[in-house]
């Protein structure tokens, strides 16, 4: 495409882009994803005839642009990964022992595949690589036109005689540590298979030859080989388009156009940095590979040779600026990738593994829509927020000061500590399973409020009035007048009420001898405590009237060891003066 090629030439010449310096280089390749034709080549800057072509000859480590090709693509294809698949971003090692870290030196914990790939976390990428059979990874990558070998005996094994590097796959490939390297044209060709629905088409610049002498025309065509399922291609497109639209685009975002992209960085080792006299953390290669439903674009940015005067810092802004200039010449398109019948979109409940469907009462902020290969989507409904079961065996008996209600209740297994311990022992939660367990317990106790029982009275209109909440399996109900009261006990969280049980009702018949006019008293403590001498503060008493806390306006007296006190502070003083022994308050 002459107009696109002219635009790339303007970018490289400096006519339409201001470069960081005169030495920094770039290689650019743009292909048509539907027929494999090379649309434009940016061979480099300040070139003369015969110079090195940075788009087609420069073999460079691809950094994180390798992750869709070596990790998540094979995972979608062979291991039924979904965009929801969970990975624990935690301290991790390669199989042979060395530690692997993330670019920012931190860990994000449990994240989805969508998040892991979008923000380019290294540890989930390695974990994905480790989960897929290596032979399948080699098959997938070779199918995209990138030559990697399973073993030194493989027919396609090759070795660079100049530096000893080879194309033998290993775990470093998961984050782009390819010793042999790739060119921008290689990457544009590979990513095109995602864009076109799963077909590899070898890139080519010649479509036909016309012989002047004879007038004969020879047409050239290349094979269009199905190299991955359409579900794999769509899932990758969905994630990488999400990355672009949420800020992780490497300069590839074009407003009003459908774009998917992945960035990549290859860092120099600390030893190399020291040897060259450049800052630790310096970068060798910067990449952005982007594509639309029509074009695939690969940009490499860096120096021919790194030395103390020519090196990249950690910032990708200069490369991103080049990519923005390049994308101005890539035709916009509002065409989107149509979801194939082999993929289904499903709303799942967050933090479930395996993925489960939300219940009717799952909070909205705990729901997320993700994409699955058809037939692998979740079908089981999560019980985490499901409606709580009703109390059973609800009884009433007259006692001193009221009518004692008692009941039985079985906590659902999903809320039991032993169940949660087993749940969080799954390998996906990794070495932090204990902290995830404690976090869930804290959430249940603090955010949801802990499970207890709401006590309700049904009024004449049939509506319910909540008069108390207790964590005990009993409650002393004091009627407000004589006659029959309809009391309902519901299992519920103290704060989160959406999934409260339907409620179990009992009729309490009062002869009028016990009337409260709405006043109810409940102890905050109600337990036997062993406390150190002179270091105790009592919880006191709570008084409610028609469900409202009236403790501060109530006249409450406390008695301990035969003495009466009118305030909690006086009670605390008295308790702390007691000799060692057993007392009742």
Regions found by a protein language model. Give the residues of each.
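Active-site SXXK
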Residues: 8, 36, 59-87, 116, ...
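A penicillin-recognizing enzyme superfamily signal
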Residues: 2-18, 28-30, 41, 47-58, ...
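Soluble, non-transmembrane domains of envelope/secretory-pathway proteins that act on or interact
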Residues: 259-518
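Solvent-exposed, low-complexity, repeat-rich "mucin-like" stalks and linkers
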Residues: 517-548
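Mid-domain, small-residue-enriched loop/turn segments at the edges of structured enzyme/sensor domains
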Residues: 98-101, 133-189
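Periplasmic/cell-envelope proteins involved in peptidoglycan metabolism and beta-lactam response
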Residues: 1-60, 65, 141, 395-398, ...
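Conserved catalytic neighborhood of penicillin-recognizing serine enzymes
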Residues: 80-137, 170, 200, 212-242
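Serine/threonine-rich, repeat-prone extracellular segments and beta-strand-based repeat modules
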Residues: 548-585
């Amino acid at each position: 495409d002459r107009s696109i090629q002219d635009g790339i030439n303007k970018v490289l010449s400096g006519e339409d882009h201001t470069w960081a310096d005169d030495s920094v280089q770039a290689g650019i390749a743009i292909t048509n994803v539907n027929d494999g034709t090379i649309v434009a080549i940016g061979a480099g800057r300040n070139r003369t005839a015969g110079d090195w072509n940075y788009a087609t000859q420069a073999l460079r480590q691809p950094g994180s642009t390798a992750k869709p090709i070596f990790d998540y693509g094979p995972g979608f294809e062979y291991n039924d990964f979904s965009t929801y698949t969970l990975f624990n971003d935690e301290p991790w090692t390669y199989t042979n022992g060395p530690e692997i870290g993330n670019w920012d030196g931190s860990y994000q914990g449990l994240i989805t595949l969508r998040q892991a790939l979008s923000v380019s976390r290294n540890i989930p990428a390695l974990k994905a690589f480790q989960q897929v059979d290596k032979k399948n990874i080699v098959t997938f990558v070779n199918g995209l036109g990138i030559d990697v070998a399973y073993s030194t005996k493989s027919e396609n094994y090759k070795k660079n005689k100049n530096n000893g590097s080879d194309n033998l796959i290993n775990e470093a490939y998961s984050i782009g540590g390819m010793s042999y390297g790739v060119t921008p044209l290689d990457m544009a060709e590979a990513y095109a298979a995602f864009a076109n629905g799963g077909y590899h088409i070898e890139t080519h610049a010649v479509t036909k030859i016309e012989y002047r002498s004879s007038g004969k025309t020879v047409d050239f065509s290349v094979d269009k080989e199905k190299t991955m399922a359409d579900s794999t291609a769509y899932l990758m497109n969905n994630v990488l388009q999400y990355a672009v639209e949420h800020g992780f685009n490497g300069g590839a975002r074009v407003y009003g156009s459908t774009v998917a992209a992945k960035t990549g960085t290859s860092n120099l080792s600390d030893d190399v940095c020291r040897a060259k006299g450049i800052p630790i953390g310096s970068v060798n290669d910067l990449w952005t590979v982007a594509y639309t439903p029509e074009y695939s674009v690969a940009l490499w940015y860096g120096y021919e040779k790194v030395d103390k005067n020519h090196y990249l810092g950690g910032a990708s802004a200069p490369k991103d600026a080049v990519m923005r200039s390049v994308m101005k010449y890539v035709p916009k398109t509002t065409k989107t990738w149509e979801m194939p019948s082999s993929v289904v979109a499903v709303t799942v409940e967050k933090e479930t593994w395996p993925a489960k469907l939300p219940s009717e009462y799952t909070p909205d902020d705990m729901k997320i829509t993700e994409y699955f290969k058809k037939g692998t989507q979740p079908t089981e409904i999560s019980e985490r927020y499901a409606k709580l079961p009703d109390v059973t065996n609800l009884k009433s008996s007259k006692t001193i000061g009221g009518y004692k209600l008692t009941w039985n209740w079985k906590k659902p297994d999903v809320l039991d500590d032993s169940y949660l311990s087993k749940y969080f022992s799954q390998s996906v939660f990794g070495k932090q399973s204990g902290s995830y367990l404690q976090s869930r317990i804290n959430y249940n106790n603090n955010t949801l409020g802990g499970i207890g029982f709401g006590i309700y009275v049904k009024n004449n209109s049939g509506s319910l009035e909540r008069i108390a909440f207790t964590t005990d399996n009993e409650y002393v109900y004091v009627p407000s007048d004589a006659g029959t009261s309809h009391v309902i006990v519901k299992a519920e969280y103290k704060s989160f009420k959406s999934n409260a049980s339907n409620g179990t009702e009992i009729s309490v018949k009062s002869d009028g001898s016990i009337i409260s006019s709405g006043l109810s008293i409940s102890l905050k403590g109600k337990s036997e405590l062993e406390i150190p001498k002179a270091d105790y503060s009592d919880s006191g008493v709570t008084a409610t009237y028609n469900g409202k806390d009236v403790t501060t306006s109530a006249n409450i007296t406390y008695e301990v060891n035969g003495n009466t006190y009118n305030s909690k502070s006086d009670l605390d003083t008295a308790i702390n003066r007691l000799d060692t022994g057993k007392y009742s308050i």
